[in-house]
Each structure stands twice: as C-alpha cells, then as structure tokens.
C-alpha cells in the first residue's frame, strides 16, 4: 500500500489558513441607564434619609401656609380689617407662590433641583422672620407675599425624592409624605394655642421660622438628582452619586458603563403644550386648580366657621361681643370682631387636621391597585359630596366629623396629583411641569379665601355649591386623563 504523502507546511499555507479562520468578535460593552441603576440598587438607608430630610420640607411649607389661618383673627382685630382684607392676605401669599413656581421650575430644569430648593428655603426663612416685624397691614401683606415666593420652590424636594425612588416604592413612599404636612399643620396650630395668648402672634412667626433654618443645614447630606445630571451631560457626577447610594445601601451597581440620553433643550414651557402632552397638561392644570381651590377652601372655611359660627346661621354661646374701636382718624367707630380662638376652637382644628392622615392607607392602596386616575376620580367625587353635607344643620360633633372627612379627602387628592404629575413628564421637563402646575393651582388658592371668608358670610349654600361643582369637574378630568402612570418607569427623554 502506498504511503499517503503529506504536504509541507509553508508560510503560504499558514496565511491561507489564517484567512479562512473566522475573526473573533469583539465583546459589546455593557451599558446601563440611571433608571437601571436606581432599580438595581433598590431601596435602602439612603432612601430613608432622603425621605426624612426631603419630607421635612412639607413640615416647613405647612407651617408657613397654615400660619395665616391661625393668625387671621388676631390681625383682623389689631388692624381693624374687613373680611376682604383678611382674605387678601392669603390671596397675595398664593400670588407670590404662583409667580415664583414657574420661575423656580425653569431654573430647576436648567441649574438643578438641589440649588433651587436651597435658594427657596433661604428666601422663605429670611422673609418669614421679617414678617414678624411688620409695622402695618401693608407691610404684612408684602412680606407674606415674599414668603409665598420662597415656599413655591419647596416642590423640588418632591421631585428629588421621586427621581431617586425605585418604581415599585414610589406609590407607597410618596403618599407617606403627607405625614410631614400633617405634622407641620398640627405643630403650628398647637404652637398658636400657646404662643398667641401669651407672647403674641409676632413671636409665633419667629418660632415658626426655626424648622426651616435647621433644615437648610441638613440639605448638605442630599445629592443633586442623578437623572438631572445625566440629562445635562454630567455623567460622571451622576455615576459618583449612584455609587455613593449603592455603598450606603450596601448594594451593587449594574455592570457596564452609564450612558446618557440624547441631549435636548430643557425646561421649555412649549414642551408642555406639545401634541404628545397637550391634553395631559391641560387636564392636569384643571385638576391642580380645583384641588387647591377645594383644599384651601376647607382650611379657611374651617377657621371661618369657628370664628363666626356660620353653620345654620346660628350663634354659639361662646361668641364674643362686637368690640367697637376708634379709628386713627377719629371720625367714628369701626367694628372689629375680636374673636381670638378659644382652646376648644384649637382642638376642633387639630381634630379636623388629623383627618389628613385618616385616608392615607386607603389612598396608598387605591393608587397602587386602582391606579392614579381612578383613585383620584373617586376621592374628588367624594369631596364634592361632603362639601354639600356641610349645609346640614348638625351638632358640633357632626361638624367636626364632616370637616374631618373633608380634610382627609382633599389631602388624598393632593397626594395623588403630586405623584401623577411627577411621574407623567420626562426628566427634561419634569420640574417645569411641576412648577407650572403648582403655579396655576395657586389661582384656585387665591380665589378660595374670597369664597370661604367673604361669599360664605353672604351665602353659605352658594359657597358650598361652588366648591362642590369644581370638585365634580376635577373628578371627570381625572377619570379621562390619557396616561396611567401606575407601574410605569420614569421617562428620561421626551
């Protein structure tokens, strides 16, 4: 048998072999987004600290807003104010809030949430302290308007919380922020019951400024939003923030490289009116306006009911007599209803305020299982009903019960629309979306004092029907919102 000949191995044959062999494929570099990192890191110690510090912004905001309700009877007497003048104070506070909300929203989308939050707190604390030295009614109105401008920036705290929370925790943690608003409301009412009768309303304002000053020092522990940093091209800062959070939570980062989306123009008002978001934006604005109108209407109506006892047109046994005081001009006597809240009045306000937390468990279940739209529609419809029930002649216990439920419902409304607005817009326009919504809703807050403190004195049923009708419109708008955000990841780009 002939032996098989083998070809000699040459350079040419090796070259042919190498050309025939497939080239090894390069491995694709793994990438991840901020959303991936937030979900991978999960919930932990950082988020608890974030919840406590950013949630405390609600304490400060509630104290500054509720302060007007407890101080109104005192300044009415001290400066001999008419009903419309008392209502005008609240209106101007919300006018300042409205003007600054859009400005702070634009600035936050361009320069960062953290910087604007800090600026708003410094502004608010400064002018709040100055208010306590107001020599006249005009100065008081002007300085409280400046406080309203500062308070409008506190919404950036909610945005920072929203952008750091994993998707499945947003529907649970964000409604719990209502606890801080409740704490602020209870704190200012309790302080007023002790401070006003002893050392006066000016010291109440000074003491109420302290929590905001303390909170400013705690902001250094909270970083700028990683989503904002990525949207502005500052990927390294976002990566450093996410790594710090992972370390604090004793968790891990996703493998790969953090990628940034296509850079777009940020913070443009026109984006809210783009065809993709036009219907959503318009309906959100209607809902915000109506919720604010109802919420502050309930708060101011509660104080007015207690101060003037308007239920069924009756007069309470404890109603003080009308005190006649001589004006500076000496031309005659001006009536001044010097009704300083009695201890029982403060107790009623505290009980009704506690209602703000009563429906929180049901509200959390509703927005997580029924969805944001249906849950909001139901609570708005119930709010309309309970406004009408206030017209029923009842005992003081019955009145407290109705006010309790109304405060619970309007608080649930605010919870849901805050969450929905923060979730429905993408990162480049989230702050301007929240800012414009917060600004327009103050129109409702500006009108509410004149309904609760002026129209209600002339036509109690007419005022209640107006509040109820607005709530019905909001319920319909909520039910027909085009986008449901339950279980939906935050959108990073438009």
Swiss-Prot record:
Family annotation (PANTHER family): SVOP LIKE (PTHR23511:SF45), SYNAPTIC VESICLE GLYCOPROTEIN 2 (PTHR23511)
Gene3D superfamilies: MFS general substrate transporter like domains
Family to which this protein belongs: Belongs to the major facilitator superfamily.
Cell compartment(s), UniProt: Membrane
CDD domains in UniProt: MFS_SVOPL
Coiled-coil spans in chain: none
Keywords, in A-Z order: Membrane, Transmembrane, Transmembrane helix, Transport
Entry protein name: Putative transporter SVOPL
Membrane topology summary: Multi-pass membrane protein
Main subcellular location of this protein, as a coarse class: membrane
MF annotations from Gene Ontology: transmembrane transporter activity
SUPFAM superfamilies per the UniProt record, alphabetical: MFS general substrate transporter
InterPro entries: MFS_dom, MFS_sugar_transport-like, MFS_trans_sf
Entry superkingdom: Eukaryota
One GO cellular component, as annotated: membrane
A Pfam family reported for this protein in Swiss-Prot or TrEMBL: Sugar_tr
Record field: transmembrane: 48-68, 86-106, 121-141, 179-199, 203-223, 281-301, 350-370, 385-405, 431-451, 460-480
């Amino acid at each position: 048998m002939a032996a098989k000949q083998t070809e000699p191995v040459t350079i040419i044959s090796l070259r042919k072999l190498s050309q025939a062999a497939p080239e090894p494929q390069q491995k694709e570099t793994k990438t991840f987004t901020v959303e991936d990192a937030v979900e991978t890191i999960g919930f932990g110690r950082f988020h608890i600290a974030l919840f406590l510090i950013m949630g405390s912004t609600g304490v400060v905001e509630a104290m500054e807003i509720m302060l007007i309700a407890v101080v109104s009877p005192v300044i009415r007497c001290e400066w001999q104010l008419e009903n419309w003048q008392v209502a005008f104070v609240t209106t101007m506070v919300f006018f300042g809030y409205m003007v600054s909300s859009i400005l702070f929203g634009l600035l936050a989308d361009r320069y960062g949430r953290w910087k604007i939050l800090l600026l708003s707190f410094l502004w608010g604390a400064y002018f709040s302290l100055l208010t306590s030295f107001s020599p006249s009614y005009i100065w008081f109105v002007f300085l409280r308007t400046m406080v309203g401008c500062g308070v409008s920036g506190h919404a950036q705290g909610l945005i920072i919380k929203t952008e750091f929370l994993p998707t499945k925790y947003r529907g649970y943690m964000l409604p719990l922020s209502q606890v801080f608003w409740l704490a602020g409301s209870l704190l200012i009412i309790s302080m007023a019951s002790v401070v006003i009768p002893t050392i006066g309303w000016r010291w109440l304002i000074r003491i109420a400024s302290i929590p905001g000053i303390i909170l400013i020092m705690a902001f250094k522990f909270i970083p700028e939003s990683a989503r904002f940093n990525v949207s502005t091209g500052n990927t390294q800062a976002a990566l450093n923030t996410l790594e710090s959070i992972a370390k604090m939570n004793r968790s891990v980062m996703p493998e790969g490289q953090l990628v940034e989306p296509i850079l777009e123009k940020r913070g443009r008002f026109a984006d809210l009116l783009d065809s993709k978001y036009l219907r959503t934006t318009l309906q959100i604005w209607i809902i915000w306006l109506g919720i604010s109108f109802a919420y502050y209407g309930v708060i101011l109506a509660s104080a007015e009911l207690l101060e003037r006892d308007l239920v069924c047109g009756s007069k309470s046994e404890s109603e003080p007599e009308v005190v006649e005081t001589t004006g500076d001009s000496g031309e005659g006597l001006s009536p001044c209803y010097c009704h300083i809240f009695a201890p029982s009045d403060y107790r009623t306000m505290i009980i009704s305020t506690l209602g703000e937390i009563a429906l929180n468990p049901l509200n959390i279940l509703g927005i997580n299982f029924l969805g944001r739209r249906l849950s909001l529609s139901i609570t708005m419809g119930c709010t309309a009903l309970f406004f009408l029930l206030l017209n029923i002649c009842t005992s003081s216990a019955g009145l407290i019960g109705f006010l309790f439920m109304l405060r619970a419902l309007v608080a649930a409304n605010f919870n849901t629309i805050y969450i929905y607005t923060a979730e429905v817009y993408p990162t480049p326009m989230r702050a301007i979306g929240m800012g414009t919504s917060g600004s327009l809703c103050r129109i409702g807050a500006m009108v509410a004092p004149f309904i609760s403190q002026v129209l209600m004195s002339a036509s109690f049923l007419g005022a209640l029907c107006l509040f109820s009708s607005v709530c019905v419109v909001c319920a319909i708008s909520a039910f027909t919102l085009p986008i449901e955000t339950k279980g939906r990841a935050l959108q990073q780009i438009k």
